[in-house]
Amino acid sequence: MESPKKKNQQLKVGILHLGSRQKKIRIQLRSQCATWKVICKSCISQTPGINLDLGSGVKVKIIPKEEHCKMPEAGEEQPQV
C-alpha cells in the first residue's frame, strides 16, 4: 500500500499568485516553486490576459474566467507584442 506522502508527491496542483503590478508570476507545485517572466498581456483576439513563457518552447495564456479567447491552432505562430 502506498504511503500518503508518496501519493501526495505524485499530484501536480498549481497555485497561481497573481498581482496586477507584478512582472512575474509564481506557480507553486506542492513543495516546489518556480517564477516565470510575463512576456506580454494580449493575444491574437486582443482579450485581456497574460501570456507566460514557461521555457522549453512552452507558452501559456491566463485569461479571466468570464472572457473567451481564440487561441491559435497548434503549429501557428502567435504574434509577439
From Swiss-Prot:
Keyword Ubl conjugation on entry: yes
Annotated crosslink Glycyl lysine isopeptide (Lys-Gly) (interchain with G-Cter in SUMO2) location: K12, K61, K65
Phosphoserine found at: S20
Superkingdom to which the source organism belongs: Eukaryota
Keywords, alphabetical: Isopeptide bond, Phosphoprotein, Ubl conjugation
Distribution of this protein across tissues and organs: In normal tissues, highly expressed in testis. Expressed also in many different types of cancers: highly expressed in breast cancer, prostate cancer and many types of lung cancers, including squamous cell carcinoma, small cell carcinoma, non-small cell carcinoma, and adenocarcinoma, as well as in Ewing's cell lines, in some Ewing's sarcoma patient samples, and in one of one alveolar rhabdomyosarcoma patient sample.
Entry's family note: Belongs to the GAGE family.
Misc: According to PubMed:11992404, the transcription of XAGE1A is regulated by methylation of the CpG island in the promoter, and four alternative RNA splicing variants, XAGE-1a, b, c have been identified.
Protein name as catalogued: X antigen family member 1
